[in-house]
Design a protein with these regions (language model features):
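Short alpha-helical segments used as structural interaction elements across diverse proteins
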Residues: 4-7, 85, 142, 159
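Transmembrane signal-anchor hairpin modules in multi-pass inner-membrane enzymes, especially those
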Residues: 1-78, 98-108, 112, 170-180
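Small-residue-rich segments of transmembrane alpha-helices in multi-pass membrane proteins
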Residues: 60-64, 89-93, 117-122
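Alpha-helical transmembrane segments of multi-pass inner-membrane proteins
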Residues: 16, 67, 108-141, 148-181
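Non-cytosolic membrane-interface motifs at loop->transmembrane helix junctions
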Residues: 78-85, 141-147
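Hydrophobic core segments of transmembrane alpha-helices in multi-pass, intramembrane catalytic enzymes
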Residues: 27-41, 81-94, 128, 155-170
């Protein structure tokens, strides 16, 4: 069972960058499932070291503070909607940390996946800029803004700039691994 859950965790981590191209639903589901896989694997393997990090403890305390603060709000239900589910991002980050520590190929494969996504988005954006439509034959209608696969949402630059630090970090980790070996 642990084997299948760990494979599920790794594949969900690989698919999350692709899911981010589709909208918010699939990445949220992926983050939640990764967090659940992480919780299961750490309980099944009795691997508590990930929970003992000072920054993780700080984020758990901060999440508890947000939930406690939400209970003091005038609109409790709306407030809980916003604060209660932030904890899934802590578990998602822990799941990625768990995968990076326990599965050495994750760094190189995730680097390749992000490279493919970056190249695809840049080529699609250039096609959209010069031809007026993208690879999926969606017309370019935004006023002086290339949207690529994001359609009406003008978030291409935001997507690329937010993934750039992750991409550079993976590049550094990948090169450090080569130098160590």
């Amino acid at each position: 069972m642990n084997y299948y859950v760990s494979k599920c965790l790794v594949y969900l981590i690989y698919l999350t960058p692709f899911f981010l191209l589709t909208g918010p639903a699939l990445p949220d589901i992926s983050a939640t499932l990764c967090g659940l896989c992480f919780i299961y694997l750490t309980i099944a393997n009795k691997d508590w070291k990930f929970y003992k990090s000072k920054i993780v403890i700080f984020f758990f305390i901060f999440s508890f503070y947000l939930i406690l603060n939400s209970s003091l709000s005038n609109n409790i239900i709306h407030s809980y909607e916003n604060s209660l589910f932030y904890i899934r991002f802590i578990f998602f980050a822990l799941a990625i940390w768990y995968a990076l520590v326990n599965y050495p190929n994750v760094i190189s494969k995730l680097f390749v996946i992000l490279t493919v996504i970056f190249i695809f988005l840049v080529i699609d954006s250039l096609i959209q800029f010069y031809l007026g439509y993208n690879i999926f034959l969606i017309e370019y209608r935004a006023a002086n803004r290339i949207t690529s696969v994001f359609g009406q949402e003008s978030i291409l630059g935001s997507f690329l700039i937010r993934f750039l630090p992750i991409y550079i970090s993976l590049l550094i980790l990948k090169n450090n691994k080569k130098n160590i070996n």
